[in-house]
Amino acid sequence: MDFVGKRFWFFIISLLVITPGIIFLILAPGLNPGIDFTGGSSMTLRFSNESNINQEQVRDQLFALSYEEATVQNLGENSFFVRTRELDEVAKDALVTNITSSLDEGAENVLQGFDLVSPIVAQETVMNAFWAIIAAAIGIFIYIWWAFRNVPSPLRYGLAAIVALIHDTIIVIGIFAILGELMNMEVNTMFLIALLTVIGYSVNDTIVVFDKIRENVLIHSNRAFPEIVNLSISETISRSLNTSFTLLITLVALILFGGATIREFLFVLLIGVAAGAYSSVAIASQVLVSWDQKSIGIPFRNRTVT
C-alpha cells in the first residue's frame, strides 16, 4: 500500500477529527473540570442492601437540598460517588444525615469516604500537570534526537514525534470536550494520569516505526527516502495494529464492566491508543517525508511510491 502517497488524505482525516473538538472547546463550555481542578468535596455513600436506591433518587435528593451542581456516579451495590461544592464538617454531616433519613432511614455508616480539595490545591494540581506534560515532551524530544543521531537530520525525528504527540493530545482533549457536554465527563487527576500514559504509548508506537526507518535507511541507502518510509510502515503496521487492537479490546471490556471511578481514565486511554496507532503511521512518518521533500506547507505535492 502507498502510505506516503496518501499522506495528504491522512492530514485531512486528522483535521476532520480535530475540528469538532476545537469547536466544542471554543463555543461550548469547554472541558468539564472536576473538583481536582475547581476545588470542592467528594464522598462515597453506601446504603443498605434492602434499600434498592438508584442514581436518580440520590441526585433528586441533592437537588432538593440545594446542591444543584452536584454530580452522582453509581458504583454498584447501592454505592454512589458524589461530587459537590466545598463542604465543612457541619455541612457534610447535615448533608449525609438528610440524604440517609430521606432515602434509607435507619441505615448506619452510610458515609464510606470523604475528600476535600481546596481551590489552592486545585490550582497547584493544574500547574503541576502542565509542567509534567511539558517535561515529558522535552524529555521525549531529547531522547529521540539522541537515539537517532546516526541517521541524517536526527532533529526531524524528534520534532516529528512531538508533532504526533501534540496531534494525539489535541484529539483526546477535543473529544473529552464533546463527552463533557454529552456525557458529563470530568477532567480530573485520573484524566491527567491517563493523558501522560497516552503520551508514552503514542511515542512508543512512533519509535517502532522510526526505528524501522532508521534500519532501512542504513540498509537501502540507494533508495529514495519516501520509498524507505513506505517500506518501513509496511513492515511494522501489522505489529502496531495487532498490539493496539488487543489493548482496545481490553479497554472496552473494562469500560463495560469496570468501576465508574476510573471511567475517565479508561476513556482517555481508549481514545489515546486509537489516536496513537493512527498517528505513528499517518502523522509522524508523513511529517518526516514532507520535511525531506520540503513540502510540509504544501500537502498537495504528493509523490506516489510503489
State what each model feature region is:
Residues 1-306:
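A structural signal for conserved, well-ordered secondary-structure elements
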